[in-house]
């Protein structure tokens, strides 16, 4: 399962990559636009009540990706991870308190993976994988803006912004 949210593109890429690798993926989010993008990758879109509210977990997953960037999201992700499973926190949590249910992690033998990827290290492998698997990463792009209009582009509420500029020189 992927818990989408403020991490927007992170969760969508996670869902798309997992489906491309053959996984069945539930994508949980409150944003209809992101739910449609997740569905276009082949994930099962599940709408939640709002950005900060989550349903009580009714299914348990071997792997859960948290891209919510909210404290209630990380808690939901952990509580949705099955015994012996792995919960990956791939989004930023800026608050001083996230309320991670440590006892739940320990009693259910859940592996919690926290940290950001370092693109410089993995980029050649990732680009090779995208090419070999014909992964449609562009599905996540919701706005393409000319370089000169970058301030306007950054002012829009969008899932994934791409700035385009003609080659220099």
Predicted regions and their residues:
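Mid-domain Rossmann-like dinucleotide-binding core that forms the NAD(H)/NADP(H) cofactor-binding site
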Residues: 1-51
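Short acidic-hydrophobic, aromatic-tinged amphipathic segments that line or gate anion-handling sites
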Residues: 44-52, 142-149
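A short acidic, Gly/Pro-enriched loop at the edge of an enzyme's catalytic core
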Residues: 55-64
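Rossmann-fold NAD(P)-binding glycine/threonine-rich loop
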Residues: 91-109, 121-128
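Glycine-centered, small-residue-biased loops immediately flanking beta-strands
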Residues: 85-86, 110
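C-terminal hydrophobic helical "lid"/dimerization subdomain
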Residues: 32, 75-78, 120-169
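Helix-to-beta-strand junctions that scaffold the AdoMet/dcAdoMet cofactor pocket
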Residues: 81-83
């Amino acid at each position: 399962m992927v818990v989408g949210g403020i991490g927007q593109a992170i969760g969508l890429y996670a869902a798309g990559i997992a489906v491309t690798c053959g996984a069945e993926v539930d994508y949980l989010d409150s944003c209809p636009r992101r739910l449609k993008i997740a569905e276009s990758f082949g994930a099962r879109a599940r709408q939640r009540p709002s950005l900060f509210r989550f349903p009580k977990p009714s299914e348990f997953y071997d792997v859960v990706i948290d891209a919510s960037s909210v404290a209630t999201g990380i808690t939901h992700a952990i509580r949705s991870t099955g015994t012996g499973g792995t919960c990956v926190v791939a989004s930023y949590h800026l608050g001083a308190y996230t309320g991670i249910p440590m006892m739940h992690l320990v009693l259910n033998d859940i592996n919690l993976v926290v940290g950001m990827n370092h693109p410089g290290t993995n980029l050649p492998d990732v680009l090779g994988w995208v090419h070999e698997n014909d992964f449609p990463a562009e599905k996540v792009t919701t706005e393409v803006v000319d370089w000169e209009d970058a301030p306007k582009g950054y002012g829009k509420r969008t899932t994934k912004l791409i700035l385009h500029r003609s080659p220099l020189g």
